Amino acid sequence: MKVSRRDFIKQTAIAATASVAGIPLGTEAANFVTDSEVTKLKWSKAPCRFCGTGCGVTVAVRDNKVVATQGDPQCEVNKGLNCVKGYFLSKIMYGQDRLTKPLLRMKNGKYDKNGEFAPVTWDQAFDEMERQFKRVLKEKGPTAVGMFGSGQWTVWEGYAASKLYKAGFRSNNIDPNARHCMASAVQGFMRTFGMDEPMGCYDDFEAADAFVLWGSNMAEMHPILWTRITDRRLSHPKTRVAVLSTFTHRSFDLADIPIIFTPQTDLAMLNYIANYIIQNNKVNKDFVNKHTVFKEGVTEIGYGLRPDHPLQKAAKNAANPGDSKPITFDDFAKFVSKYDADYVSKLSGVPKDKLRQLAELYADPNVKVMSLWTMGFNQHTRGSWVNNMVYNVHLLTGKIATPGNSPFSLTGQPSACGTAREVGTFSHRLPADMVVTNPKHREEAERIWKLPPGTIVEKPGYHAVLQNRMLRDGKLNAYWVQVNNNMQAAANIMEEALPGYRNPANFIVVSDAYPTVTALSADLILPSAMWVEKEGAYGNAERRTQFWHQLVDAPGDARSDLWQLMEFSKRFKVEEVWPAELVAKKPEYKGKTLFDVLYRNGQVDKFPIKEVSTEYHNAEAQAFGFYVQKGLFEEYASFGRGHGHDLAPFDRYHEERGLRWPVVNGKETRWRYREGSDPYVKAGTGFQFYGNPDGKAVIFALPYEPPPESPDKEYPFWLATGRVLEHWHSGSMTRRVPELYRAFPNAVVFMHPEDAKAMGLRRGVEVEVVSRRGRMRSRVETRGRDAPPRGLVFVPWFDASQLINKVTLDATCPISLQTDYKKCAVKIVKV
């Protein structure tokens, strides 16, 4: 087969990308089809399975197997590029230990909590699962059942799960693993703008004059977006890049303003910037007067620890951490005035000239600024605050909702936005930014879902961290985990996670494609379909919703999470899960199953199977007899249409490479809240932050407060955890790709060479990382891509053989309830 010049150049670029990760690209590994069988390949579009960037790929299938993938040149997000993980997508589904049958712990032919895993049929698996869930519901009621889901759920999987729990079981104890990554971003948006998700889009990369990275290593975690920043920086010499972190990483290679700061002091630096803007008369007074109001948040809000923890007992406002009161601009100016260069430099360890350079980027009215952040902001005991505070500096200067002026929260999972946030799979949320605590929102959800009034419970359910605590305490007893690996991902796993899974009173179900740490801790493992083994939809960080068709069948008896949810719902009649007075309000539901009420309700089942594309298989449509995905999507979309969350009709997404909502009259929206761009902004207003009743954004006065745990004589190091380029999250997919595994096979303890020398350690020496909660064994690394300052160590968490979350602290932001994985105190002990 001839290779065109374009393909040759593209493959050279692939090889260069791979070489950065130290990956040899042999004939097999190159993922580039060059044989004569190429004409037998069927290529189709799909979004990448990994991060929240939402890159488009084209997928080649032959003989019911994915054999190649490549970047989709028609996708606006990545324009044909992929990162090194994306180039190996074709291999993630074919690990040697792929789960293909349900596995139940058994002894002497029966379920036993202490038994060994044995293969069973789906009927046997659901029989035991049904027995356990009904037992718990009968004995303790709906507050004792729960689910932990995912920002990797497809849109309809998350929607079906939310309906099953919030409407079917009448339990709000459903939360996604996006609680660990995006909850603070959600609260930041909701508190400031009254609506979730960014007002800008990826087009801002080509329009900005300055980029400020707050706690984000985009070079490794969002490499395709990083190429757009790099292109802008190198092609427009006046462009500036500031990178702020607690340790040096690859993104610093492009930094004009590199800043290493003491953990937690980003709060103080943001107040310094606000103060600098005010003191130097750089406030955009017209914008501020027309479009903002000021509030002061309560302080001393605690750290989301157990109620008997001394820090929680001392927290005066732990019960209402999100409260605030109105203030004036003058009050705000006085509040931030103490955050001058001298104070903040001493607190943060950042030289005053660096602080000034940073502040000048925001203050200069002629510089368009894009602020970008991920886990450094969000995984923070004041994560909601720090999100609010970055909006403060954009609002004070009016640098918002216009091309190149964009405070932009980057997303870590492929559908943390599209599913966890937009669908509302959090324990307190409903679709389209509605919440269970609002009676009007509950009423609207009950109307759309055809439920009797009072079905949806007002009280929010257990969030992610609280779920583990309630499992341990025996208050949450029937528990289903889908598309996540929380026994590796949760903080303080030995004290707060594992005990709950092994609690004899609890029955734990894990749906996964591989035998993860979490799956092996469960009582029942259900084999799940992956990625293009099912029809799906994701929503990325720029509000872009993307669809794909099922391209291959799942192996063996593996089934999609959607099928599992819907099939399991057939096991429950409404009388078994709803009180008699609720059933009496809808007597026609008596004797019906939850499947009938939730999924065969005249809406979800309204689209016949003949509407499924004849070019593709659809396992769920075949199983249930109607176009399941279309019915679920259209019912879900009805929540947001006409309310600023408009989605296009289902079929259009299969034709497009994604659309950014709100989609009104067939047109997507690039910049929200701006007249002329957002159809919801009234003419003559200029800007309208219509998520809030007054149409104004909130500027919050919030202080610096210390972290719950800092280094001391016994535990002298800060610990930060995170990711690396080659692996994604817990590594359950990427570590099964041989090339990615070889590139970075095991986690290490990155530390400063002088710290290692002072302790008599050298590179490669085996050590233990020890905290007040646990210990983990690894090896020292004093070279390479990550360079911590003295007094801090960085450990990636992708390695199932090195569970760094044995060590971390399960403290959270009390407002968002998101865990802080970036700072706790540890010591390093030579083995």
Curated annotation (Swiss-Prot):
<keyword id="KW-0560">Oxidoreductase</keyword>
<keyword id="KW-0813">Transport</keyword>
<comment type="similarity">
    <text>Belongs to the prokaryotic molybdopterin-containing oxidoreductase family. NasA/NapA/NarB subfamily.</text>
</comment>
<dbReference type="Pfam" id="PF00384">
    <property type="entry name" value="Molybdopterin"/>
</dbReference>
<dbReference type="InterPro" id="IPR050123">
    <property type="entry name" value="Prok_molybdopt-oxidoreductase"/>
</dbReference>
<dbReference type="InterPro" id="IPR006656">
    <property type="entry name" value="Mopterin_OxRdtase"/>
</dbReference>
<protein>
    <recommendedName>
        <fullName>Periplasmic nitrate reductase</fullName>
        <ecNumber>1.9.6.1</ecNumber>
    </recommendedName>
</protein>
<dbReference type="GO" id="GO:0009055">
    <property type="term" value="F:electron transfer activity"/>
</dbReference>
<feature type="binding site">
    <location>
        <position position="822"/>
    </location>
    <ligand>
        <name>Mo-bis(molybdopterin guanine dinucleotide)</name>
    </ligand>
</feature>
<feature type="binding site">
    <location>
        <position position="379"/>
    </location>
    <ligand>
        <name>Mo-bis(molybdopterin guanine dinucleotide)</name>
    </ligand>
</feature>
<dbReference type="InterPro" id="IPR041957">
    <property type="entry name" value="CT_Nitrate-R-NapA-like"/>
</dbReference>
<dbReference type="InterPro" id="IPR006311">
    <property type="entry name" value="TAT_signal"/>
</dbReference>
<dbReference type="GO" id="GO:0043546">
    <property type="term" value="F:molybdopterin cofactor binding"/>
</dbReference>
<keyword id="KW-0479">Metal-binding</keyword>
<dbReference type="InterPro" id="IPR027467">
    <property type="entry name" value="MopterinOxRdtase_cofactor_BS"/>
</dbReference>
<dbReference type="InterPro" id="IPR006963">
    <property type="entry name" value="Mopterin_OxRdtase_4Fe-4S_dom"/>
</dbReference>
<feature type="binding site">
    <location>
        <position position="181"/>
    </location>
    <ligand>
        <name>Mo-bis(molybdopterin guanine dinucleotide)</name>
    </ligand>
</feature>
<keyword id="KW-0249">Electron transport</keyword>
<keyword id="KW-0574">Periplasm</keyword>
<feature type="binding site">
    <location>
        <position position="485"/>
    </location>
    <ligand>
        <name>Mo-bis(molybdopterin guanine dinucleotide)</name>
    </ligand>
</feature>
<feature type="binding site">
    <location>
        <position position="83"/>
    </location>
    <ligand>
        <name>[4Fe-4S] cluster</name>
    </ligand>
</feature>
<feature type="binding site">
    <location>
        <position position="375"/>
    </location>
    <ligand>
        <name>Mo-bis(molybdopterin guanine dinucleotide)</name>
    </ligand>
</feature>
<feature type="binding site">
    <location>
        <begin position="245"/>
        <end position="249"/>
    </location>
    <ligand>
        <name>Mo-bis(molybdopterin guanine dinucleotide)</name>
    </ligand>
</feature>
<dbReference type="GO" id="GO:0006777">
    <property type="term" value="P:Mo-molybdopterin cofactor biosynthetic process"/>
</dbReference>
<dbReference type="GO" id="GO:0042128">
    <property type="term" value="P:nitrate assimilation"/>
</dbReference>
<dbReference type="Pfam" id="PF04879">
    <property type="entry name" value="Molybdop_Fe4S4"/>
</dbReference>
<keyword id="KW-0004">4Fe-4S</keyword>
<feature type="binding site">
    <location>
        <begin position="214"/>
        <end position="221"/>
    </location>
    <ligand>
        <name>Mo-bis(molybdopterin guanine dinucleotide)</name>
    </ligand>
</feature>
<dbReference type="InterPro" id="IPR010051">
    <property type="entry name" value="Periplasm_NO3_reductase_lsu"/>
</dbReference>
<dbReference type="GO" id="GO:0016020">
    <property type="term" value="C:membrane"/>
</dbReference>
<feature type="binding site">
    <location>
        <position position="177"/>
    </location>
    <ligand>
        <name>Mo-bis(molybdopterin guanine dinucleotide)</name>
    </ligand>
</feature>
<feature type="binding site">
    <location>
        <position position="797"/>
    </location>
    <ligand>
        <name>substrate</name>
    </ligand>
</feature>
<dbReference type="InterPro" id="IPR006657">
    <property type="entry name" value="MoPterin_dinucl-bd_dom"/>
</dbReference>
<dbReference type="Pfam" id="PF01568">
    <property type="entry name" value="Molydop_binding"/>
</dbReference>
<dbReference type="GO" id="GO:0030151">
    <property type="term" value="F:molybdenum ion binding"/>
</dbReference>
<feature type="binding site">
    <location>
        <position position="55"/>
    </location>
    <ligand>
        <name>[4Fe-4S] cluster</name>
    </ligand>
</feature>
<dbReference type="GO" id="GO:0045333">
    <property type="term" value="P:cellular respiration"/>
</dbReference>
<feature type="binding site">
    <location>
        <position position="152"/>
    </location>
    <ligand>
        <name>Mo-bis(molybdopterin guanine dinucleotide)</name>
    </ligand>
</feature>
<feature type="binding site">
    <location>
        <position position="48"/>
    </location>
    <ligand>
        <name>[4Fe-4S] cluster</name>
    </ligand>
</feature>
<feature type="binding site">
    <location>
        <begin position="721"/>
        <end position="730"/>
    </location>
    <ligand>
        <name>Mo-bis(molybdopterin guanine dinucleotide)</name>
    </ligand>
</feature>
<keyword id="KW-0408">Iron</keyword>
<feature type="binding site">
    <location>
        <position position="534"/>
    </location>
    <ligand>
        <name>Mo-bis(molybdopterin guanine dinucleotide)</name>
    </ligand>
</feature>
